[in-house]
C-alpha cells in the first residue's frame, strides 16, 4: 500500500535537501496508476515504472498478480495516467512456462498500442531461494528464451530504440533507471541499500531497528563490505558495457588506465569467437555488439541480479519481528 501524500512529502523534502537531484524514478504496481491520488505525484516524479509482467490473464493468475486487476484493467489504468509523467516505463517479463509465442505476441501488440515512452523486457529471474517445484511450475525451458527474445527485438525495434539488452525507448537519448551502467560509483541510502564506491560493495543493514540506531548514533548504516580486485572490477564493467550494447576501448583507457584488449584478452577473444561482438570498421574505439551479444548480456545480467537477490534473501533471513 502506497501512502501517496507521504510519498509526495518525502520527494519534496528530498528535493529541498538535495537541490542537485535531476531525476526522480519511482516503481509501482499497476493498480496504483488507477488511484485518483496518483495526480499528487505529477511534477515530482520524472520516471514512473510500472511492473506489469504480462497482460495475459492466465499468466497473471499463475503469478498471483491478478490481484492488481485483469490485463484489460491494467492497460486502462496505465493509459489514463501515463501522461502525468515525462517518462512512463512498463516492465514486462518473458520466459514463463505456458507463455506461448502467441501470448507473447499479444503482449507486445498490446504494448505497442499502449505506446509508453519506455519498455523493459526482463527474462524471468528465479533465485536459489525459490523452491525447485515452484521453479519448474513457472519457468519455461531455457531454450525457449532465445526465440522469445528474437520476437521481442523484431517487434519492438520497429518503433523503439534499444537502450540496453532489455530496455527500449522512444528515442536514443532516453534516461533510464540502470544507474549501474553509466556510473562507476553509486551511493545507496536507506535500510537494505547497496553502494559501490572505489573498489568496494557496501550493503546497509536490512534491520530497520539497527539502521535507525546506527544513524541516530552518528554512524552509517553499512553492515557488510566486499572488496574487489582490479581484474574483477574490469570484468564487471565489461559485462555492463556488453549489456548496454556499447563496449568502448577509450573508456577502459581513460577511467581504468588499461588497454582493454590486453587486460581482458581472454574475455574479449571469447566474446569475438562467440559472435557476441565484432570490430567496428568506422570506429576502432567501439565494438559492435551483435544480437547474440545482446542476448548474452541479457542472460548474464539476469544471473547477476538473481545473485544479488540471493544476497538480499540471506541478509533478511536472520531478521526478527523487532527488526522490521
Regions found by a protein language model. Give the residues of each.
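Short amphipathic alpha-helical interaction segments
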Residues: 258-273
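A short, conserved structural fragment
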Residues: 272-282
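Short, amphipathic alpha-helical interaction segments positioned at domain boundaries
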Residues: 292-324
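C-terminal scaffold of the Radical SAM
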Residues: 1-258, 319, 323
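Minor-groove-contacting beta-hairpin "wing" of winged helix-turn-helix DNA-binding domains
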Residues: 284-290
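Short Gly/Ser/Thr- and Asp/Glu-enriched loop/turn motifs at secondary-structure junctions
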Residues: 89, 281-284
